[in-house]
């Protein structure tokens, strides 16, 4: 299995290099499938400098900011690594997300316009005549877009801020787990129930459905997420654990 691809967007003019590099790297890390690869997820300063067309100084400054946020780990004489979480940490993050997103859903029932809510249906329009499992990659992207939209429709900037760093891991775990246990079809059904509750402006029901939906992911990780501890262990213990992963330890 090839390592996750790092796709970095070009810089804009008018902002400091450090801040631009920070934003571009953070977005690139969000888009990586960091739990779908048994090896370390390593970043290379020289490669980043070439991709962004800047010196290594703003790269290092941006990486320091990302390290302070707990997104990367800088190891002297070894390199820069994207931080992956243990099974327990992921479950705790999902529970925190469930609390924040369920509140966002209640607020969306009060604050979102009818047009806003209709855009949630648009996200899944292409699945009206095909099952989500028929195009799992497209559905995975739609699933992630849906959850980001719910937070946005709350009109609560603080919720967007609080969920920002959680989203890096939530996105990767959702993308990985959606392929398992018929979760795509179940997810589609639950999304529709949430949208209908929003249309009825039933904030209490929408909040409960959103919370139960996300806690279902926590239960799934509890059952199938032991590999997360192996991935984390591989980062610490090195080649022996990595070899065990490559020899067939099942990913979720």
Cite the ranges covered by each PLM segment.
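Short linear motifs at protein or domain termini
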Residues: 1-106, 110, 226-252
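C-terminal all-alpha effector/ligand-binding and dimerization domain
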Residues: 2, 168, 172-252
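Alpha-helix initiation/capping motif
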Residues: 10-18, 41, 93, 132, ...
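Short leucine-rich amphipathic alpha-helices used at interfaces
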Residues: 61, 67-68, 74, 81-82, ...
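Conserved amphipathic alpha-helical segments that form helical-bundle/coiled-coil interaction surfaces
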Residues: 93, 111-175, 188-197, 205-216
């Amino acid at each position: 299995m090839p390592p996750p691809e790092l796709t970095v967007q070009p810089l804009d003019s008018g902002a400091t290099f450090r801040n631009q590099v920070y934003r571009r790297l953070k977005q690139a890390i969000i888009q990586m499938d960091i739990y779908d690869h048994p090896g370390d997820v390593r970043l290379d300063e020289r490669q980043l400098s070439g991709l962004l067309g800047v010196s290594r100084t703003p790269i290092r400054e941006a990486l320091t900011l990302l390290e302070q946020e707990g997104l990367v780990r800088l190891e002297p004489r070894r390199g820069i690594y994207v931080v992956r979480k243990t099974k327990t940490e992921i479950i705790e993050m999902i529970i925190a997300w469930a609390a924040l997103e369920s509140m966002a859903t209640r607020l969306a029932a009060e604050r979102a316009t009818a047009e806003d809510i209709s855009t949630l249906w648009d996200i899944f329009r292409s699945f009206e005549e095909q099952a989500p499992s028929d195009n799992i990659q497209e559905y995975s992207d739609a699933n992630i877009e849906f959850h980001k939209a719910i937070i946005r429709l709350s009109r609560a900037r603080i919720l967007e801020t609080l969920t920002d760093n959680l989203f890096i891991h939530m996105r990767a775990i959702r993308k990985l787990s959606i392929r398992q246990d018929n979760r795509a079809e179940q997810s589609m059904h639950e999304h529709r129930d949430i949208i209908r509750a929003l249309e009825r402006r039933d904030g209490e029901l929408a909040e409960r459905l959103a919370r139960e939906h996300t806690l279902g992911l926590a239960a799934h990780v509890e059952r199938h997420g032991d590999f997360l501890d192996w991935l984390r262990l591989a980062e610490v213990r090195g080649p022996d654990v990595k070899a065990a992963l490559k020899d067939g330890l099942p990913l979720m």
